[in-house]
């Protein structure tokens, strides 16, 4: 009896001790993880500062040796003229390179867009093949483009101190075409946000107004090119990540069909997700620059280095064609209410196109809520976000991700319950929650089939109207910092074309007027939910900020999409750079 009581007492003590030990271990592990994350952030910022110091010293050295160079005139040259002067010998690659390097260093002070100086670029500068289509052109790279000897952190501590062993395929092709990749630019943590901030490098600001987001996830590219610090850059796009920064920063950007360019060697935080296609594409100040970049990349070098890419060279005759186009258009997708400036931008562009002899036809892709809430959200998070969350173990979560991490960490049953409870008041949020639950392989295959069937239905709808291209609104103006992650529904105008895998590009066409800004007081949104409320507040106080439209074509018709973008650009003349 006594032994039994002693054993019971010891068992109780052991249970308490075990629980305390487990709790202590969890606390220690969390503390250790956070210490590692702090160390990673410290090292990342030290390397960033060292990179910027190296840039500055290189520029000062060059300026001392070349005091008569007219840098300002060089910076105003369109890319096509720049290339012509480089190939003719009128400009030296060194003059162009160090001029843009100095400008990048300068604009970084106000935007925090550069994460790393790709120091061996000076070797590439001396070795660039003169016959290349991009001979001597400095090119900036979104940080996810692997570059030998440099980290691609994606703003995550687990990737700090893990330099790439080789260049990704498109960087190799750029070099073979004579280009000089020179900097990595900032991204939001994990790249799954249309803001641009992370715990390693901090917040990137919009060059037009520092309280506004540059967009994301190619936000560093948008800020750098938009402020004149790079003539050409490469970004990626899985929900609008080229188009948001381009629109918010007043530049042009193209999201091609998913497999038009090689993704081999790109750094990501989730691999194997193919239901919603990732694309990579160019960003620049004008459409001609986008076309030149695409033409340079779609070459034998690319098709040899990555045989999985369809060997489709750039079709110059399609891009240069001048026949009148049949243009579908819509003023709203009835999911995200356009701001007054968005609606005006679309209407004015439509009117200019009609006056130029093109035929404009009302057209709205069918069942957009289904494409967004079921197909896109379900495709991106078919595992319930488990693979995505692996990247955050022991790390800090940046505010730009909003409530995404919290939602993904909820148990599947609780997501379902919460979805049912929210549905009467917040149907959009409820639908997204329900779609972000893990699926079986059988249900994933079914979802992928539904995506393909939806794609075919929109193509059939398009062909029935005999359309060439489509004109749509593009979200804008730029949102306040730290708000994009809390206005998820606003990706509706862009993510639809990732789900469909259609090429889509953006062109700035106007700027926000005082009247546009005043009319935002009347903005209510279509649902009056938290996303609409945040969006209304985030787009205020935007007079003078750029606003774009989106141009869309059918799969593999990038040249036609660019031709349409060029037409829009020529008809509309907004201010090109922040003052």
From Swiss-Prot:
Catalysed transformations (reactions): N-(5Z,8Z,11Z,14Z-eicosatetraenoyl)-ethanolamine + H2O = ethanolamine + (5Z,8Z,11Z,14Z)-eicosatetraenoate; (9Z)-octadecenamide + H2O = (9Z)-octadecenoate + NH4(+); 2-(5Z,8Z,11Z,14Z-eicosatetraenoyl)-glycerol + H2O = glycerol + (5Z,8Z,11Z,14Z)-eicosatetraenoate + H(+); (9Z,12Z,15Z)-octadecatrienamide + H2O = (9Z,12Z,15Z)-octadecatrienoate + NH4(+)
Residues annotated as transmembrane: 9-29
Residues modified as Phosphoserine: 241
EC number: 3.5.1.99, 3.1.1.-
GO cellular component: endoplasmic reticulum membrane; glutamatergic synapse; Golgi membrane; organelle membrane; postsynapse; presynapse
pH dependence: Optimum pH is 9.5.
Catalytic-site annotation from UniProt: 142, 217, 241
Stretches of the chain found on the membrane's Cytoplasmic side: 30-403, 434-579
Membrane topology: Single-pass membrane protein
PROSITE patterns referenced in this protein's UniProt entry, alphabetically: AMIDASES (PS00571)
UniProt-listed InterPro entries: Amidase_CS (IPR020556), Amidase_dom (IPR023631), AS_sf (IPR036928), Endocannabinoid_amidase (IPR052096)
Tissue expression remark: Found in neuronal cells throughout the CNS. Expressed in liver and brain, and to a lesser extent in spleen, lung, kidney and testes.
Regulation: inhibited by trifluoromethyl ketone.
Keywords from the named record: Endoplasmic reticulum, Golgi apparatus, Hydrolase, Lipid degradation, Lipid metabolism, Membrane, Phosphoprotein, Transmembrane, Transmembrane helix
Intramembrane runs of residues: 404-433
One biological process term in Gene Ontology: monoacylglycerol catabolic process
Positions with a binding annotation for substrate: 191, 217, 238-241
GO MF: amidase activity; fatty acid amide hydrolase activity; hydrolase activity, acting on ester bonds; identical protein binding; lipid binding; monoacylglycerol lipase activity; phospholipid binding
Subunit field text: Homodimer.
Family stated for the protein in its record: Belongs to the amidase family.
Function according to Swiss-Prot or TrEMBL: Catalyzes the hydrolysis of endogenous amidated lipids like the sleep-inducing lipid oleamide ((9Z)-octadecenamide), the endocannabinoid anandamide (N-(5Z,8Z,11Z,14Z-eicosatetraenoyl)-ethanolamine), as well as other fatty amides, to their corresponding fatty acids, thereby regulating the signaling functions of these molecules. Hydrolyzes polyunsaturated substrate anandamide preferentially as compared to monounsaturated substrates. It can also catalyze the hydrolysis of the endocannabinoid 2-arachidonoylglycerol (2-(5Z,8Z,11Z,14Z-eicosatetraenoyl)-glycerol).
Name of the protein described by the UniProt record: Fatty-acid amide hydrolase 1
Species per Swiss-Prot/TrEMBL record: Rattus norvegicus
Gene that encodes the chain: Faah
